[in-house]
C-alpha cells in the first residue's frame, strides 16, 4: 500500500503505464517500455501519436488483473525482465496529477517530499534537496520481515575527499571509491570489488561532415588496435576490454554460464586485448592517405570526472605517440555529464555536434541479446549514428524470432551482433569498470559478496555494533 494507507493495486500499474507512454509527457523511457524485452502492441505507435490508447495492448481487467498483448510470443522470463525495468516504477495518480502543469507536458512529481509518496521497503521521512534524504522502514511493506535496517540516510556529497572524511569519521557506512582513493585503500580488508555491468567505449560520430575520416573504416580500426588497454586499465584500476558484452552477462542462468565463457564469446576476443601497434600504424597510414591528409586533429568530449579525465588523457598521449605527433593530435574538452549526453545525442539535428566521446551502456545481465538495443536504428537515445540493416535484422531475430529459444540460436546471434560492432570499429571498447566500495565493519551484508542483478543488497544489510 501507499504510505497514506491507500491500496496499491492494478489501477496504479495501469496509470503508470499510461503515463510512461503519454505522447505529451515525452518520457525518455517510453521506448524502453514500449519495445524492449517484449514489444507491446501499438505502444510505440501511441507514444508517437499514430494510435489511440484503446489500441494499445495494455488492458485493465479488474483491481488485481492486467493483460499485456505482445507482438510476438514471449516466455515468462522475458516478461519479468521487461517489467523489472525502472520505467515500471509505480507512480501515485493523486500526487502525479497534483504536480502536473496546465498543458500536461510536465509534472513536479518526485522533485521534493511534498511532491512524492512512498510505497516500497522504506518511506521518505525527510528530504532536503541537494543535501540529504532520510528514509524509515515501512512496516506495511509485504516483505518487512526481511528488512533489518530501521532506516537509511543518504547524503548528497559531490567532493570525494569529503566523502572519505565522512566515512573515516563514522558518519556514513559505505562509500564508493574513486581511482585515487582506491589506491590509498587497495589493501584494506573493508574494500569490496565487483565487475561493472558495462564496457566503456569510444563513441565515433561517423557522419560528422567536418571530419569525414571518421567514416573511414580503416581509420576507426586504427584507433581500435591503437589502444593499449592493459596499461590503461592498470592505471585506472579497471579491467581491459576489447569486447562489448560484459563479463557479467549470462547466456544460461541455470548453468551459470556467461557469454564470455562460451566458445562463441571467446572467439570474439583478441590477443593482447586488441592492442596491435604495427597494425594500427599501417591502418592509420592507409586511412590518412585515402583521405588526402597530412595531419589530423580530433576533439574528444568527456565528462568532467577523475576517471574519464585519466582515460581521455591516456589516449591524448598514446595515440599521437603511436601515429606520430606531427600527423595526429587529440584535443580534449571536459563538460558535465548531462551536458555531454546532450552533445552526443545532438548528432540527429546537428551532424557536427561532436567527433569522439565516451559511452558505456548498462544492459540486462540476464539478456545479453537485449542489451544490444542501444545500437539499433530504432533506439531513441542513440549516442552515435550507427545504423546498420544487418545489425537490426540480427537483433530482431535474437529478441523476437520464433526460433530464438532453440539451442544455440541466441548465442550465435549475440556473437554476431558483437562482431558487427567491433570488426568495423563502429564502437571502440576500452575497459570494463570495477565497482569499488569501502564498507564499515559494523555493516553486515546479507549476501556473500556481489550478486548478479542484486549487487551488494545494501537495503537488506544489518547493523552489528
Residue ranges and their predicted role:
Residues 14, 28-99:
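Surface-exposed binding/hinge segments that line
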Residues 437-465:
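Long beta-strand-rich cores associated with HINT superfamily self-processing modules
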Amino acid at each position: 500500500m501507499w504510505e497514506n494507507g491507500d491500496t496499491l493495486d492494478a489501477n496504479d500499474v495501469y496509470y503508470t503505464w499510461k503515463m510512461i507512454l503519454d505522447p505529451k509527457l515525452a518520457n525518455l523511457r517510453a521506448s524502453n517500455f514500449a519495445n524492449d524485452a517484449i514489444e507491446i502492441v501499438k505502444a510505440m505507435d501511441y507514444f508517437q501519436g499514430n494510435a489511440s490508447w484503446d489500441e494499445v495492448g495494455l488492458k485493465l481487467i479488474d483491481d488485481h488483473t492486467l493483460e499485456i498483448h505482445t507482438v510476438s510470443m514471449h516466455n515468462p522470463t522475458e516478461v519479468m525482465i521487461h517489467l523489472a525495468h525502472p520505467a515500471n516504477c509505480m507512480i501515485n495518480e493523486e500526487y502525479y496529477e497534483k504536480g502536473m502543469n496546465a498543458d500536461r507536458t510536465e509534472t513536479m512529481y518526485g522533485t521534493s517530499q511534498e511532491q512524492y509518496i512512498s510505497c516500497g521497503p522504506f518511506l521518505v521521512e525527510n528530504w532536503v534537496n541537494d543535501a540529504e534524504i532520510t528514509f524509515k522502514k515501512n512496516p506495511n511493506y509485504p516483505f518487512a520481515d526481511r528488512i533489518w535496517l530501521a532506516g537509511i540516510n543518504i547524503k548528497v556529497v559531490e567532493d570525494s575527499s569529503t566523502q572519505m572524511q565522512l566515512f573515516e569519521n563514522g558518519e556514513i557506512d559505505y562509500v564508493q571509491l574513486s581511482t585515487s582513493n582506491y589506491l590509498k585503500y587497495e589493501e584494506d580488508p573493508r574494500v569490496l570489488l565487483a565487475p561493472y555491468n558495462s564496457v566503456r567505449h569510444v563513441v565515433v560520430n561517423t557522419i560528422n561532415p567536418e571530419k569525414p575520416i571518421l567514416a573511414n573504416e580503416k581509420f576507426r580500426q586504427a584507433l581500435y588496435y591503437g589502444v593499449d588497454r592493459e596499461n590503461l586499465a592498470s592505471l585506472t584500476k579497471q579491467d581491459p576490454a576489447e569486447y562489448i558484452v560484459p563479463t557479467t552477462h549470462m547466456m544460461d542462468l541455470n548453468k551459470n554460464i556467461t557469454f564470455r565463457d562460451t566458445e562463441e564469446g571467446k572467439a570474439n576476443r583478441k590477443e593482447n586485448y586488441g592492442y596491435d601497434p604495427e597494425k594500427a600504424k599501417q591502418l592509420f597510414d592507409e586511412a590518412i592517405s585515402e583521405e588526402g591528409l597530412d595531419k589530423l586533429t580530433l576533439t574528444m568530449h568527456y565528462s568532467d570526472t577523475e576517471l574519464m579525465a585519466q582515460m581521455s588523457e591516456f589516449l591524448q598521449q598514446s595515440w599521437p605517440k603511436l601515429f606520430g605527433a606531427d600527423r595526429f593530435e587529440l584535443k580534449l574538452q571536459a563538460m558535465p555529464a548531462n551536458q555531454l549526453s546532450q552533445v552526443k545525442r545532438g548528432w540527429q539535428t546537428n551532424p557536427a555536434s561532436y567527433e569522439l566521446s565516451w559511452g558505456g551502456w548498462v544492459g540486462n545481465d540476464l539478456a545479453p541479446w537485449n542489451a544490444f538495443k542501444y545500437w539499433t536504428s530504432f533506439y531513441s537515445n542513440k549516442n552515435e549514428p550507427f545504423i546498420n540493416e544487418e545489425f537490426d535484422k540480427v537483433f530482431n531475430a535474437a529478441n523476437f524470432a520464433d526460433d530464438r529459444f532453440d539451442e544455440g540460436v541466441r548465442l550465435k546471434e549475440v556473437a554476431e551482433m558483437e562482431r558487427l560492432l567491433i570488426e568495423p570499429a563502429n564502437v571502440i571498447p576500452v575497459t570494463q569498470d570495477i565497482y569499488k566500495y569501502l564498507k564499515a565493519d559494523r555493516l553486515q551484508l546479507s549476501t556473500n559478496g556481489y550478486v548478479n542483478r542484486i549487487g551488494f543488497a545494501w537495503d537488506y544489510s544489518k547493523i552489528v555494533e
